[in-house]
C-alpha cells in the first residue's frame, strides 16, 4: 500500500480529467451476466461472499465484520509484530456497529430491517438491545453463519436471517440499517434500492447507511468501465458519490439525507489490519485450496484499497436518512 498510495494521491494529475472521461470509450464493458437484476445480483454476491467462510475468518476479526471500523484515537495501532491480535480491531468494529444502531435509534422493541447481513454481528448486537431483526442476504454461506451466531448469542428468536434480494422485502420497519451494501447494487438500481427503503420504512422511522464513496466527477468518468477488480473481486460493483446519493434520494423517495459523516482514514487503517492478517495467514489460506495466484491477487486487492483510502481517492460515509 505504501507504494500505491502516492500514485492514488496524484491520480488526477497522472490521468487528466479528459482522459479519465474517455475511459468509457476504450475500457471493457460490464458483461450482461453481471448486471444486478435479481439473477445477476445473486450470482455476483455468491462469487465473492461464498468463497469460504473460513477464508474470511483468517483475516477478519472475531466479529467477522467486513466493512470499515471506526477507530478511537486512544486505541493503539496494530503493529506488524502482532497481526493476530484482534482485540483492537474487534473493538473498533463494535464501535462502528453501535454508532450505526444509535443513528437509527435502535432500542428495545424496534422493528429493524438490515439490508446485507454480512456474518451477523450487527443483527446480534441489535437483538441484544431487544430489537426484532429481519436481515436479508444473497449469500448462503453468510446466512448459515449468521443464524448460528444468533443462536449462540441467545438471540435466535429475535433474528430472522432471510435469503432474499432487498427488492423482495415486505413489511414495515421502524429502522433500516445497511452497511456497505449499496456498492453491490449497481448504478442503474440505486433508485430501486432507496425506493425499497422508503417503501418499508414506517412513519417516524430512521435509516442509517454506511457507504464507500468517490468524488462525483470520478464517478461520472468511470461509470460503465470494467476493471480488474470487477472481473476478479467484486463483479457488478460500483461506488457512489455523496452527490449521487443525495440526488437519487431526493428524486426517488420521500426521504432526505439529514447527516453525513466521513472517516476514510479509518478505512485505510482497517484495510491495513486485514492485509497484515492475510499476510500472516497465507499458508492457512492456501491450505483451504486457494492457490498462489489467488493469494497474490487478494493481497494486491487489499493494498490497492488501502491506498485508495489513505490517499483520499476513496472515502467512506455514515448517513442518516429521514422523512
Where in the sequence are the language-model features?
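Conserved SAM-binding strand-loop segment of SAM-dependent methyltransferases
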Residues: 153-166
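Conserved beta-strand signature within the Rossmann-like core of class I S-adenosyl-L-methionine
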Residues: 204-212
